[in-house]
């Protein structure tokens, strides 16, 4: 059986009188960019096999930040335009917005595309989560939009600490990776807040995937990573270590292929139709063509600066806006005051794993 959630498989087996044959670890997440083949040959069932269908060419672009930005953001803009015409031709559109590089560029590109397509930009809102009235994201969102004379589009979504429930997020995401669960808990609070205010709202767009494409994660925080492993491996942040790696989970895929549930599932359970243009293959293909080694010379600081340079240059080339660029901040760290955010989530991964097991064995 194929489904988008583990609990759907569980429900089907229960209804078929086969509940005793279920365990969440028996399921297999289909990895992004592969065809998954399952051989139905009887007991014992063999593991699936995987055939890659998407293999972008690395280092295909010139070491020119302006040209890279033009191509990269141009691809994002085209996909947003296609989405607007095919799936979002009518009804209000919400941007999950922090004023960061990814959500900021998505807002500006969506606004620009709507004008280009003759759509009414009054349909657009920038939704920013603020927990207990705090968080740097709301301040940043205000600065971002004010700098471009677009402040009228901002709509803060207020939540309380009680609205941020990491145990609920574990059940919704059906996973236990701490950073993904923390992000999903904030996404649930945001989506629930929007739903309470606008019962009929359907469309959301966000910037998930932008960090993975431009390799903008602090390498120092992960003892398994070096800048050489990040820059030498094809789509490392999108796919993890790869389906043939000893580090690859049997149940889950890796990288954003696994982690994207943090964005998809909260929106889905709250009744939204979401879109993340940075995850489009056409966009990832251009990102993988960036000559990162030549542009960074293996330096962490240059790598962390590169994303803002590329995206800002591309946004200017595509829309004419001079986009403000702020320092990277995770969703769970920006939506609440930093000193309070730590109290919302347990520090140990074992707590998340325990909650995951309890969800299936109450």
Identify the residue ranges that each predicted region occupies.
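Non-catalytic structural connector segments
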Residues: 347-351
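ATP-dependent adenylate-handling active sites, centered on carboxylate activation for C-N bond formation
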Residues: 55-319, 332-346, 356-361
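A short alpha-helix-loop-beta-strand transition element characteristic
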Residues: 320-327
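RNA-binding accessory domains that recognize and position tRNA/RNA substrates
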Residues: 1-92, 269
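Short, intrinsically disordered low-complexity segments
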Residues: 4, 27, 122, 328-329, ...
């Amino acid at each position: 059986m194929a489904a988008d959630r583990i609990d759907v498989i569980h429900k089907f087996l229960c209804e078929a009188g086969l509940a005793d044959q279920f365990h969440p670890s028996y399921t297999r997440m289909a990895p992004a960019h592969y065809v998954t083949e399952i051989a139905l040959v009887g007991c014992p069932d063999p593991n699936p096999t995987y055939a890659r269908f998407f293999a972008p060419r690395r280092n295909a672009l010139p070491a020119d930040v302006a040209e890279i930005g033009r191509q990269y953001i141009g691809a994002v803009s085209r996909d947003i335009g296609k989405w607007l015409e095919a799936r979002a031709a009518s009804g209000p559109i919400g941007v999950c917005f922090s004023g960061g590089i990814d959500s900021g560029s998505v807002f500006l590109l969506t606004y620009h595309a709507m004008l280009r397509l003759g759509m009414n930009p009054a349909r657009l809102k920038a939704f920013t989560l603020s927990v207990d009235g705090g968080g740097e994201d709301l301040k940043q969102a205000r600065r971002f939009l004010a700098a471009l004379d677009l402040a009228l589009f901002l709509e803060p979504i207020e939540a309380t600490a009680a609205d941020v429930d990491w145990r609920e997020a574990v059940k919704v995401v059906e996973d236990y990776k701490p950073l993904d669960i923390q992000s999903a808990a904030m996404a649930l609070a945001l989506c629930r807040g929007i739903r309470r205010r606008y019962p009929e709202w359907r469309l959301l767009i966000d910037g998930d995937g932008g960090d993975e494409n431009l390799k903008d994660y602090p390498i120092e925080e992960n003892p398994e990573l070096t800048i050489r492993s990040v820059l030498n491996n094809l789509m490392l942040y999108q796919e993890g270590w790869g389906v043939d790696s000893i580090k690859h989970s049997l149940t889950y895929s890796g990288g954003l292929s696994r982690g994207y549930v943090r964005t998809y599932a909260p929106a889905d359970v709250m009744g939204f139709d979401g879109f993340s243009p940075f995850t489009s293959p056409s966009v990832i293909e251009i990102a993988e063509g960036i000559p990162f080694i030549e542009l960074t010379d293996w330096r962490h600081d240059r790598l962390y600066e590169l994303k803002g340079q590329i995206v800002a240059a591309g946004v200017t080339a595509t829309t004419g806006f001079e986009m403000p660029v702020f320092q990277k901040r995770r969703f769970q760290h920006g939506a609440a005051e930093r000193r309070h955010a730590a109290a919302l989530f347990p520090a140990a991964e074992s707590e998340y794993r325990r909650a995951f097991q309890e969800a299936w064995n109450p």
